[in-house]
From Swiss-Prot:
The keyword Nucleus applies. Acts as a component of the outer kinetochore KNL1 complex that facilitates microtubule-kinetochore interactions and the spindle assembly checkpoint. Kinetochores, consisting of a centromere-associated inner segment and a microtubule-contacting outer segment, play a crucial role in chromosome segregation by mediating the physical connection between centromeric DNA and spindle microtubules. It is found in: Nucleus; Chromosome, Centromere, Kinetochore. Keywords: Centromere, Chromosome, Coiled coil, Kinetochore, Nucleus. Component of the KNL1/SPC105 complex composed of SPC105 and KRE28. Part of the ten-subunit outer kinetochore KMN network that includes the KNL1, MIS12 and NDC80 complexes. Interacts with the MIS12 complex subunits MTW1 (via C-terminus) and NSL1 (via C-terminus). Interacts with the NDC80 complex subunits SPC24 and SPC25. Interacts with CNN1 (via N-terminus). It comes from the Eukaryota. Its main location: nucleus. Residues 128-175, 229-258 form a coiled coil. This is Outer kinetochore KNL1 complex subunit KRE28. Pfam families: Kre28. Belongs to the KRE28 family.
């Protein structure tokens, strides 16, 4: 029990350290996100204030008539930025048109008045004027298209970068939430383990008190030693079976995940094989829980052995003097090849011909039954359970 208590304390220490580490990291990430948001808003506000110094049409002051202008708080409301940007874009278009008109006049005068040979233009419909005007418009449109294309490209890059950044930020927050949930589940499991350990300690104390009331000290020592040996055996068996059961569940989960991933590629034959394998693992899990985990030292099965290279399973039935050996015909798609029932009689081991014939006729080359169903049925029938 001291070893179990020490293990629980170690688990509690590790969980506490992990929990503290996640809390510190999560708080640091949230603080960085909040600081980044404040800096972004500050940059937006600073940019608009800088524009306000050069342009009177930008007013970043709070619209509150009850306060003097000097007492108003300077701020920028992000919700109205889109509308304001549209207004500014319209104004910039007007400024652009005005600038282009002036530039057109500049080109016009440059090509007409600066020449040593002035052009004789009768009107705006004059061919030379029309040609020069078209050239100016072409240059204007070319420059405008290039600049607008660059602006749109930069805007798209900014939007994509912002979207990717937001997705990664949300993913980080979700990972911290999932980690917190996993830690809570670990605490629940640890508390459950602690309760089970306490119950086991109480049961052991009750058995100890009962033994101490015995008058025979030799029997007490012998019984204590026997119980201790049984406890060590059960602990090792429980650890081994728990590990094997965990591995089986992992294999089952891997098969399920693999089946989901390859569902689109081969939904016919593959799903049938995966389903059969999952069914086999489920039957193995139930068989293990029924005859080992739930019964513990009271199990009716002894010397359970699996010969993977031979495709063979062998075990004994306690108190019945039976030895059962089951051979498989194919490891990839196992079917029962042969069932051998041996019985210990005196000092000899003989074949139970009647049981052999019965079970072989029933299960040999039968594709509809799994080996674990066969094993469970044989045990139940021989032990009359």
């Amino acid at each position: 029990m001291d070893t179990g208590s020490a293990s629980i304390k170690d688990y509690e220490t590790v969980l506490t350290d992990i929990e503290d580490s996640i809390a510190v990291s999560s708080e640091e990430v949230l603080n960085n996100q909040e600081l980044r948001l404040k800096n972004t808003l500050h940059e937006i506000t600073s940019s608009i204030l800088a524009i306000n110094e050069e342009n009177k049409f930008v007013n970043p002051l709070r619209n509150d008539e009850s306060l003097d202008v000097e007492g108003k708080e300077v701020f920028v409301n992000p919700k109205i930025l889109s509308a304001k940007i549209k207004e500014f874009n319209k104004l910039m278009e007007l400024l652009k048109l005005t600038y282009l008109e002036q530039e057109t006049l500049d080109y016009f005068f440059r090509f007409t008045l600066s020449s040593t040979k002035p052009l004789q233009l009768d009107s705006e419909k004059d061919p030379q004027f029309v040609k020069l005007n078209e050239r100016v418009n072409d240059l204007k449109e070319e420059i405008s298209n290039v600049q607008e294309s660059k602006i749109e490209q930069i805007k798209a890059e900014i939007q994509e970068t912002g979207h990717n950044f937001a997705e990664k930020q949300d993913l980080i927050n979700e990972l911290y939430l999932e980690a917190t949930g996993d830690i809570e589940n670990c605490w629940d499991s640890l508390n459950e383990l602690k309760n089970l350990t306490n119950k086991e300690d109480k049961n052991m104390m009750g058995e100890k008190d009962t033994i101490l009331n015995s008058s025979d000290s030799d029997d007490f020592v012998e019984e204590t030693y026997t119980n201790w040996q049984k406890l060590l055996f059960l602990q090792k068996q429980n650890q081994r079976l728990t590990k094997e059961l965990k591995e089986m569940h992992e294999v089952k989960n891997q098969i399920i995940r693999k089946g989901e991933q390859s569902k689109k590629e081969d939904s016919g034959h593959l799903m049938a094989n995966e389903s059969e394998l999952c069914q086999s693992i489920n039957l193995l899990t139930k068989f293990w829980e029924k005859h080992f985990l739930l019964k513990g030292s009271k199990t009716t099965i002894l010397n359970f052995e699996i010969f993977t290279q031979l495709g063979k399973v062998q075990f004994e039935i306690k108190d019945m003097q039976y030895i059962i050996a089951i051979s498989l015909s194919d490891l990839k798609r196992p079917m029962i090849k042969d069932i051998t029932i041996l019985q210990k009689a005196g000092g000899n081991i003989v074949t139970d011909i009647e049981a052999n014939s019965k079970f072989n006729n029933k299960y040999r080359n039968n594709t509809k039954v799994q080996i674990f169903e066969v094993m469970d049925d044989i045990i139940s029938e021989l032990t009359n359970e």
